[in-house]
Amino acid sequence: MSWTYLCDAADVAPNSLKLVDANDIRVVVANYGSGFRAIPPICPHMEEPLDESGVIANCVLTCTKHLWAWNLISLELLGETEKPLKTYELKEEDGKLLAFIAEELTYDFEEEDDMDDDFFSKS
């Protein structure tokens, strides 16, 4: 495939996430303050939509559902996080964010998670 327009860089505020549609593939653009990442729209843990549950602070993306976190600069897994965050190659040209999308990035999910680690569930 080729480079695909995602959005203007100015459309994604610092420390925020924006869900975009790139030729029928949903992508989340993450602005971590000093740069951008293009990632699949769901957390690799439990299929939680990152545009709704993701929070960025100090260059770290955290899914608030189960507190999995990744450093958006190094992509290092933080804390109890068990799976890497997949990313699309991204570049900025003339204020526009473009991703190289050869195929949709997806995760394999395990069915046996019983949600006991759901920090926000009601007991």
Swiss-Prot record:
Entry binding sites for [2Fe-2S] cluster: C43, H45, C63, H66
Cellular-component GO terms for this entry: cytoplasm
Record-linked Gene3D superfamilies: Rieske [2Fe-2S] iron-sulphur domain
Occurrences of domain Rieske (ranges): 4-99
Cofactor binding notes: Binds 1 [2Fe-2S] cluster per subunit.
Alphabetic keyword roster: 2Fe-2S, Cytoplasm, Electron transport, Iron, Iron-sulfur, Metal-binding, Monooxygenase, NAD, Oxidoreductase, Transport
InterPro entries xref list: Rieske_2Fe-2S (IPR017941), Rieske_2Fe-2S_sf (IPR036922)
Subcellular location as annotated: Cytoplasm
Catalytic activity: methanesulfonate + NADH + O2 = sulfite + formaldehyde + NAD(+) + H2O
Record's keyword annotation contains Cytoplasm: yes
EC number in record: 1.14.13.111
Regulation of its function: MSAMO is inhibited by metal chelators (such as bathophenanthroline, bathocuprione, neocuprione, alpha-alpha-dipyridil and sodium EDTA) and by sodium azide, sodium arsenate and potassium cyanide.
Record has Hydrolase as a keyword: no
Source domain of life: Bacteria
Family in the record: Belongs to the bacterial ring-hydroxylating dioxygenase ferredoxin component family.
Self-association state and partner proteins as the record states: The MSA monooxygenase system consists of 4 proteins: the 2 subunits of the hydroxylase component (MsmA and MsmB), a ferredoxin (MsmC) and a ferredoxin reductase (MsmD). The ferredoxin component is dimeric.
Protein name as annotated: Methanesulfonate monooxygenase ferredoxin subunit
Gene giving rise to this polypeptide: msmC
